[in-house]
Amino acid sequence: MGATLLIMAAGMGSRYGGNKQVDGLGPNGEILMEYSIYDAIRAGFDKVVFVIKPGMKETLASICGDRIAKKVKVDYAFQDFSSVPSFYHIPEERTKPFGTVHAVLVARDYIDQPFAVINADDYYGVSAFSTIYEKLQTLAPEGEATMVGYQLQNTVSKNGTVSRGVCHAVNGNLDKVVETLKIKLCENGEIRDIGAGEPGELLDPLAPVSMNFWGFTPWIFGKLEEYLATFLKGLAPDAIKAECLLPVFVDELMHEGELTVPMLTTDAVWFGVTYKEDKPFVQAELRKLHESGVYPASLHE
């Protein structure tokens, strides 16, 4: 049995200051998601679905989509307001789509097998893809999902605060996800949640966090649809930036007793570009991976 890789690439990248999904960061101009796709294919994934903004397809196809389509099946799903339930009136001031729950849901018509979900602008590491691929092969058809957890200390930025789903596990299963929106790496090395102001709550640097690397079966789409509808019905008219987030959805489904989530651990290194200032570090790390033989000289060959 194969598996599909769903890549969420429709985010605006407001903190980064540009469209980071298609910013060339590798030594040959490779974009970050090309590394994830390369790792996924060698792990066994046989299909890629890009979730993108309308208007991005031609650019993404020319950068990497057409080349990848020679190796695995490729589809494009659009995250825009046309997929929002008809009962919801979209405020004129709203420009952003409705978050990661919405992003996964718009890919529904393109997925009929177990699938992994990732962000386009994160580097997840080679072993993480083989680990989740193996787990996807044994997921129960209904009521079970999985996720790859990363150490909090390996996912913060020196250049500003980050948002992370801080996880707690019991007997290997995810028990709680706390979506923490303003995590700061302090000058003294401490990591704090400053969402309610500084100095903020001290966080465990070894705590596992969600980087939106999830594994699901198609059963989840019905639950996503119900959850998004409930979210929109409860949304205030002036909440023009509110997002429906995947970690919060998973947390609620777990506590309703509808979902069990075995948490996978990995020694893979994560890095990403939340801010433009993160770019030189990411470029240097990718260069090292090529030079050490983790990747060939070019992913474009």
Language-model-derived ranges and their functions:
Residues G215, V261-L264, G272:
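Conserved active-site beta-strand element of glycosyltransferases/polysaccharide synthases
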Residues V126-W214, P218:
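Conserved core of the sugar-phosphate nucleotidyltransferase
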Residues A3-G17:
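A phosphate-binding catalytic loop at a beta-strand-loop-alpha-helix junction
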